[in-house]
Amino acid sequence: MADKLISKIPDGPLAEKWTKRKSELRLVNPNNRRKLEIIVVGTGLGGASAAATLGELGYNVKVFCISDSPRRAHSIAAQGGINAAKNYQNDNDAVYRLFYDTIKGGDYRSREANVYRLAEVSAAIIDQCVAQGVPFAREYGGYLANRSFGGVQVSRTFYARGQTGQQLLLGAYAALNRQIAAGTVTSYPRHEMLDLVIIDGQAKGIIARNLVTGKLERFGAHAVVIATGGYGNTYFLSTNAMNSNGSAAWQCYKKGAYFANPCFAQIHPTCIPVHGEQQCKLTLMSESLRNDGRIWVPKKMEDVMKLRKHEIKPSQIPEEDRDYYLERRYPAFGNLVPRDVASRAAKERCDAGFGVNETGLAVFLDFSDAIKRLGHQRVQERYGNLFDMYFKINNVSPWEEPMMIYPAIHYTMGGIWVDYDLQTTIPGLYAIGEANFSDHGGNRLGASALMQGLADGYFVLPITIADYLSHKFAEPKTDINNPAFDKAEKDVQARIDRLFAIKGKQTVDSIHKKLGNIMWEYVGMARSEEGLKKAIKEINDLKAVFYKDVCVPGEQYQFNQELEKALRLEDFFEIGELMARDALNRNESCGGHFRVESQTEEGEAKRDDANYMYVAAWEYKREGQEPELHKEPLKYEFIEVKTRNYKD
């Protein structure tokens, strides 16, 4: 394992770094690739695209999916679009502008070189997906259509109505299936990685649980790729699929992979508000809706009270009595400010008492102006399925009344630390997509998650991993009877036995919900020193309750979702604590991390570049010992660092 953080960022001009790095990387002869085995954990956009591409190159790939099909990956839930710098709208977009918007949107807490590479390969992603048959929306003349997303002033987002993630995943899934049929990829559905196996300091395999039979199984390889997404479900209520978890990444952390910027969690501004105590998941309404929808609350408190009592409808409030607060506060960007800015603005209005539902935690997203301007057919073409989804959930038609929305946990910018090659601090272990921290800094721009996942999977990892594997083809296949596999399996079995032995009375979900309440209260949209210290204490207290009183019914050797959830909750406790610890250490406000002690007179985020312009990479020590913080300084040579301004 590396003794310090070596990012491997090439020297030279920004636009030449990726080309230079590719020229330095070693290659693997096509005939030697078939001698090499690669494990890919996760089958969302990052994992599916990586496995398909590596298989097509001739490597022997084993791909693992916790669901019955890659089509169930959470990538399928992405709605609004994918960014690419193609300048199809002739609005002065460019690779540099996408790079600049991403750095600025991330509040100057991401690497220049990684972000520029992401922008550089973005156009190739669209070409690849079109070749796969992804049905992107098109203009009248047949050209691919674009729309805008938050934090930008150009239209660079390619989309397929409100189902972009689904269509992109089907394209990657088709490519993956082709390689499965060709025999280069072996698929393991309903398998969950529970530990990473290290031999001689290198990642050599995993221990996975067959979720159908309950059996622990061993898998060896020359390299391991983690593509399991983020850890947003630490909060219990989030927009993530309920199966989404951070356990695979967390087990890598506990085996020596540094975990970077865990406190950077994104809160999405356009989600359907919480409906009641029994809710276990939140529903995202696409950011694309902010293209044409206008966000507002009433100006008069009397109107707010009437709305809460259902005495009036939103459409009955006159235009002059509506506060379009984003347009008022940020005239240059209006409703298309970045997500962290829009979320805090909604919280501010609701905290001031202007929330429009019974709980006081909702604002309006109104399409009446767009319907008048564009007509019913155009709006239906762009947002029809989203309108239908909202109606099915709320029994309110967005054609007649505004949607009600409120911020919710959505994405995590933090993740496993990786270098420029996407390799972690453990040789042979790579992390891609949302599982790593690489590209988004303190806040991700909308439509950039799909871009990063496919960039890593199609165009970056297949090139960089060859450098590591170039001298491995002469090595024998990993022996799964190695003592390291014995120990890893024994450790996993001990975790399972411990959970079954508790025989308590509280359900896993009830305890997870309490953890989520702690996280949302103290590590949510507004954080303070006092609250974060309280969070760490309460998380550990709740963890003690879990190990004393949790009930895990059933048996190991059967389909047992309660056991699955209990194993993940063990990790969520530790992830939540590290998030709070990282947030406590970062005594500044930047992106999705907002410390109440560090804000301007107007309530905007106040960065501390002198003390916190670095990537915080945490190293696990051992149980009961605090992790060690390593700092990777961030240097900006090709962009001017300044306070984000979305007002003019």
At which residue positions do the language-model features occur?
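Core beta-strand elements of the Rossmann-like FAD/NAD(P) dinucleotide-binding domain
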Residues: 34-36, 214-223, 425
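Conserved N-terminal glycine-rich FAD pyrophosphate-binding loop of Rossmann-like flavoproteins
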Residues: 67-100, 266-270, 278-281
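Conserved redox-cofactor binding core of oxidoreductases
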Residues: 125, 130-215, 220, 227, ...
